[in-house]
Amino acid sequence: MVRVTLVNYTRRPLETITWAALVSYWDEWSTESFEKINEDDVKAHLPRILGYGHESILEHATFTFSIEGCSRVCTHQLVRHRIASYTQQSQRYIVLNEENVEETFVIPESIKKDRELYEKWKKAMAETIKLYKESLKRGIHQEDARFILPQAVRSKIVVTMNLRELKHFFGLRLCERAQWEIREVAWKMLEEIAKREELRPIIKWAKLGPRCIQLGYCPERELMPPGCFKRTRERWMKLLEKPL
């Protein structure tokens, strides 16, 4: 099971974004005016400014997540989003100690459905762990012993993105056509934001969702799975059930 946690974010993020936006055209703007920005100011200005497509202001708010238990297949996709900061568990310094195959590796459900194949996978992965540990016992350094480990090995990573990049990330990775594991991570990240009462409005105003939510239509119509727009929209709307 992948665990995603929003561990930190910009203090008063909506007020910060609004305050930054107002510097462009508010004569009374000052450093001190930040503390005067309130919820009414946010509601009065932020939806309108974002509605114009002026999204650079979103870069003034950042969010830091911890992601635990995903595979290196997933983290390799994650770090392709280059306007972000990443720090990942190192196989050079951390020794793989788990004996349980399920706790050590991510095994896709498609493999588990084929019982015979699943048993072969577990056997192969158990042999991988055995050979990895034998290499360490023979004096092979961790930085070399890790070469035997597959991409399925579970990892941990800390991710920091500004809100504009987070919107771009969600647009691509919440889509049903995204690979299943990173899609699961992306939904958990969005759900973590939705848990915070002060953050939930930005999901609606900035349209933090897959591209079909952001655009109002699917840009990959010919490729989309049947019914995915309806399913995705319903799941997204559930995050907004409480009044904004």
Swiss-Prot record:
UniProt GO molecular function: flavin adenine dinucleotide binding; NADPH binding; thymidylate synthase (FAD) activity; thymidylate synthase activity
GO biological process, one term: methylation
Pathway: Pyrimidine metabolism; dTTP biosynthesis
Nucleus is among the record's keywords: no
Residues annotated to bind FAD: 56, 80-82, 88, 162-164, 168
Record-listed dUMP binding positions: 77-80, 88-92, 146, 173
Cofactors: FAD
Family, as annotated: Belongs to the thymidylate synthase ThyX family.
Subunit structure: Homotetramer.
Protein name per the record: Flavin-dependent thymidylate synthase
Organism lineage string: Archaea, Methanobacteriati, Methanobacteriota, Thermococci, Thermococcales
